[in-house]
Amino acid sequence: MLYKTKAITLYNINYNDNYSIVHVLTEEFGPVSYLTAKFKKQKTHLSKSFFHPLSLVELEVEHKNLREIQYIKEAKTYIPLVSLLNNPIKSSICIFLAEFISKALKEKQSDKLLFNYILQSIQVLEFIEKNYSNFHLVFTIRLSQFLGFYPNNTDYSKGMYFDMQNGIFVQQQPPHTHFVHSDDSWIVAKLLQMNYENMFHFQFTRNERKKIISQILEYYYLHLGGFSKIKSLAILHSVFD
């Protein structure tokens, strides 16, 4: 049976000389892997931009629940993303976020609210012209709202610790190693105040920004079983150096 669905490209890998496997997040089915002919041989009108991380596409697909790899009948661009393709800094952010999404949501079923959050976030990044160095911080921590472990920021005051295991600020040092020290917890509190509208007003040094994303990733390791190391983190760091 054929279905139509919006989708977000995450990454692709070579299958053989003629085919690739493209991993996407679909609105209707959640994360799905599709077998596609490589660009020169494809017959489904796939453009090169389809394979770019975080491309927004519309698909007509076969879908069988027990089949590990599905098939695309037709694909077309849903929303063109010009700056994400041509801006090297934005492209690097896309590579990082696509890997992050694929690892954070690999066990996730279809969730239209989550899909729309990611879709709208990509459009925000497309249209921002400058001052987007905090974008990945906002995106990653806000995604945890849809996964059920967004931190509680209501009780923060200066000098508190941030307990990563429980996602809360506490007065005393937690009896485990997964916490942010009281000297640095103010950064977490600032992070939780940020959104796409106000993120331009929050200034961090390069080292603070590196520390924040490392803490966010550790937070995901603690709360998502199987969440593995993000290989493209070094690429992200390099563009902001």
Swiss-Prot record:
UniProt organism field: Azobacteroides pseudotrichonymphae genomovar. CFP2
Primary gene name: recO
Lineage: Bacteria, Pseudomonadati, Bacteroidota, Bacteroidia, Bacteroidales
GO terms classed as biological process: DNA recombination; double-strand break repair
Transmembrane regions: none
Keyword DNA damage: yes
Protein keywords: DNA damage, DNA recombination, DNA repair
GO cellular component: bacterial nucleoid
Coiled-coil annotated residue ranges, if any: none
Protein function: Involved in DNA repair and RecF pathway recombination.
Similarity comment: family membership: Belongs to the RecO family.
One Pfam assignment: RecO_C
Protein name: DNA repair protein RecO
